[in-house]
């Protein structure tokens, strides 16, 4: 008998599986349907609110139904197969692309467990337990996909009082902030193409501080950005700085959900994992006229979140280079960069005069709705402001306004309206403070991937000798491949805590299909099984996204090892495939497969002799002084190309003047292809490739001081 542990996924929880109700003890299910709403109307209404906001940049994604549901007023009680008392209550809101709930008076007793799940338990959150209780009694849950969810509450004995919580809000997602269907955003709204993924080379200077940035879901319906900040006591107190127009009251702070590490693992638009979230915070300081709020998280981020506490600088001197890391449209983490000094400026009549740093034009990327509260960093990765709003977009990335950290410091003497009281408990009054990663030893964690700049995540089909499709090289197939694996080398005493898989394809009709994660030691030519690290039902994965699987027990392999995905328990008719890269040259192939009982590397097996690696990101702890980012480099690249997936226009930004005669584009046959050139400045050009056949191209650019080449993917504009 196989026992599946940890099938529940989502925010900080205790894992496990919902208990089954005894067949002879099942009562009538209780279902409540919310009043009908139109997603199209709600989107229109959201746009109207945005226009009236005068450039502020929060994102409204959900409609709130205020309710009062509790075990004494709704739902049905049953007995489980092992004698526990089970309360179930189903909520439906027709047309919702996801649902999330807010609880009040949330005070679970020590043995109680709560789960939330979609129809058929395809997606499960929990178990939530007494460790999720907070001083405020407010508890927010991450959205679950679809328009129906069930709350299951489990207690060992049916006491006289069972109202250990009240559901007070049902939030109907009309935009689609989860990746549940083939489109990354079902309503077609995601971050614009000029946005730069935070793991692109252009962001290397701010590599450490990116782990401070989080997406904030405010009361289940609005999305903003924020950042963990350090204080002079250097005690890892989990303060998050954001905008006042995002979190302005204690109620909003209590009902916020903070999502960390929501990003692509490499420089490409692969959707991130959404499981690293924490519910609730306490408002410490806020000031509407300077548009800042400081909150303290109810739960400190655990080591597996790899939290970094950003430093800050309260000097009034303007830095020469600025970057903002944020979540535009609530999408994966992006970065916008300005290589010029900002200007001191005013923004809107309701704010203090000259209370803002104005980015006059972004050199790379932009901000959008959802970016509100996002930090503005100087070149030393110190926070100098938080985004309030502005006019910037991809078409015209100009005029964004960031509330000044130096004014928020102590412009007002009231401790509830300033930052100094909270961020300088040591009373040393420094002008600046560096950021810090406080975890160490066994708690120091990092992530590792072989995806690199210039890669594209894709799926390669297999063909048999008759040219008939026989499945995927990195997934289910009819060609004898039973396991696919990624090879890692991590010298030291690191412990493996989990792995994130970039799932590219899922077809799941059989609820019993599952994947098994195995760890193999590699010693010379000998590959031996170390352990079975996890088993996960196929129904628990999101397609077209990274899916983090945290192991129940840490694994310590030898220095070189394989992280393998066993496919043998995928039932007939079901399909799964993991994204991978395809390279016509190095670096060394790290993608391996087990075929007919023996291990082979992908390069020597595929007829096109592609190199490759799986879209897999390893979570390891006890990493010592090793770099936690696989591809960070000490010096920025001489040229920056964006986007890497091009519909027509490619931008090239360089640190030195561009020589137009050095600029040419080749196809994979080495043939130069035509393009249209527009010089925006001495160091910024755009080339238009319209009329060329979709495919992979190599772009070359240079001057007397540098030369650079970059691979892009040209696609049709839909």
Predicted regions and their residues:
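C-terminal outer-membrane/trafficking sorting elements
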Residues: 4, 9, 507-509, 513, ...
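Protease-domain processing segments flanking chymotrypsin-fold serine proteases, especially trypsin-like
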Residues: 11-86, 135-142, 147-230, 439-472, ...
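Short beta-strands within extracellular/lumenal beta-sheet-rich domains
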Residues: 82-91, 477-490, 546
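Short, surface-exposed beta-strand/strand-loop-strand elements in extracellular ectodomains
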Residues: 109-122, 514-522
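Serine endopeptidase catalytic core focused on the charge-relay Asp
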Residues: 144-355, 359-360
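Catalytic nucleophile loop of clan PA
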Residues: 227-237, 365-388
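C-terminal subregion of chymotrypsin/trypsin-like serine protease catalytic domains
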Residues: 271-277, 284-287, 377-447
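Beta-sheet-rich sandwich/jelly-roll-like modules and their strand-loop junctions
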Residues: 439-523, 555, 560, 566-624
């Amino acid at each position: 008998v196989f026992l599946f542990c940890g099938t529940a996924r989502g925010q900080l929880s205790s894992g496990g599986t919902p208990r089954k109700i005894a067949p002879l003890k099942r009562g009538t299910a209780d279902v409540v349907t919310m009043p009908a709403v139109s997603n199209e109307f709600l989107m229109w209404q959201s746009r109207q609110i945005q226009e009236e906001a005068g450039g502020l940049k929060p994102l409204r994604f959900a409609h709130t139904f205020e309710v009062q549901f509790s075990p004494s007023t709704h739902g049905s009680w049953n007995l489980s197969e092992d004698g526990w008392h089970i309360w179930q209550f189903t909520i439906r809101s027709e047309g919702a692309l996801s649902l999330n709930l807010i609880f009040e008076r949330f005070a679970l007793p020590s043995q109680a467990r709560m789960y939330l799940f979609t129809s058929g338990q395809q997606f499960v959150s929990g178990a939530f337990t007494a460790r999720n209780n907070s001083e405020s009694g407010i508890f927010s849950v991450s959205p679950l996909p679809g328009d129906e969810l069930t709350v299951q509450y489990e207690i060992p004995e049916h006491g006289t009082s069972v109202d250990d919580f009240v559901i007070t809000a049902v939030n109907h997602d009309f935009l689609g902030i989860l990746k549940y269907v083939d489109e990354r955003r079902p309503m077609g709204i995601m971050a614009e193409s000029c946005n730069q993924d935070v793991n692109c080379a252009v962001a290397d200077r701010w590599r450490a501080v990116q782990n401070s940035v989080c997406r904030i879901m405010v009361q289940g319906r609005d999305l903003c950005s924020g950042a963990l900040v350090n204080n002079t006591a250097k005690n890892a107190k989990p303060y998050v700085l954001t905008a006042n127009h995002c979190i302005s009251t204690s109620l909003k702070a209590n009902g916020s959900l903070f999502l960390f590490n929501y990003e692509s693992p490499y420089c490409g638009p692969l959707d991130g994992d959404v499981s690293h979230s924490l519910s609730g915070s306490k408002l410490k300081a806020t000031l509407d006229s300077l548009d800042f709020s400081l909150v303290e998280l109810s739960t400190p981020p655990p080591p597996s979140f790899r939290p970094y506490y950003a430093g800050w600088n309260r000097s009034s001197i303007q830095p020469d280079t600025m970057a903002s890391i944020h979540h535009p449209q609530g999408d994966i983490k992006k970065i916008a960069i300005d290589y010029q000094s900002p200007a001191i400026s005013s923004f809107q009549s309701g704010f203090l005069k000259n209370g803002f740093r104005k980015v006059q034009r972004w050199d790379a990327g932009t901000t959008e709705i959802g970016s509100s509260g996002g930090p503005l960093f100087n070149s030393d990765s110190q926070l100098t402001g938080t985004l309030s709003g502005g006019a910037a977009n991809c078409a015209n990335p100009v005029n964004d306004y960031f509330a000044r950290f130096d004014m928020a410091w102590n412009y007002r003497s009231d401790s509830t309206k300033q930052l100094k009281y909270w961020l300088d408990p040591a009373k040393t009054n420094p002008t600046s403070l560096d950021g810090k990663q406080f975890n160490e030893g066994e708690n120091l964690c990092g992530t590792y991937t072989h995806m690199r700049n210039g890669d594209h995540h894709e799926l390669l089909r297999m063909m048999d000798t008759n040219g008939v499709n026989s499945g995927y090289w990195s997934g289910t197939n009819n060609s004898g491949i039973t396991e696919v694996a990624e090879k890692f080398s991590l010298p030291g005493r690191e412990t493996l805590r989990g792995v994130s898989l970039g799932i590219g394809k899922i077809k799941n009709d059989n609820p019993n299909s599952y994947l098994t994660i195995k760890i193999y030691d590699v010693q010379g030519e000998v590959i031996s099984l170390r352990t079975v690290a996890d088993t996960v039902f196929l129904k628990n994965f999101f397609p077209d996204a990274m899916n983090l699987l945290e192991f129940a027990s840490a694994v310590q392999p030898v220095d070189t090892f394989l992280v393998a995905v066993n496919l043998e328990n995928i039932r007939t008719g079901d399909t799964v495939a993991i994204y991978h890269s395809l390279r016509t040259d190095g670096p060394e192939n790290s993608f391996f497969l087990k075929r007919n009982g023996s291990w082979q590397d992908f390069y020597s097996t595929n007829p096109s002799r592609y190199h490759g690696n799986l879209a897999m990101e390893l979570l390891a702890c006890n990493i010592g002084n090793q770099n936690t980012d696989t591809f960070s480099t000490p010096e920025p690249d001489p040229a920056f190309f964006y986007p890497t997936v091009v519909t027509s226009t490619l931008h090239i930004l360089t640190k030195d003047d561009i020589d137009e005669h050095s600029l040419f584009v080749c196809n994979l046959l080495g043939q130069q292809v035509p393009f249209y050139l527009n010089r925006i400045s001495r160091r910024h050009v755009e080339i238009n490739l319209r009329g060329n056949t979709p495919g992979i191209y190599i772009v070359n650019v240079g001057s007397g001081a540098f030369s650079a080449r970059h691979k892009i993917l040209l696609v049709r504009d839909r």
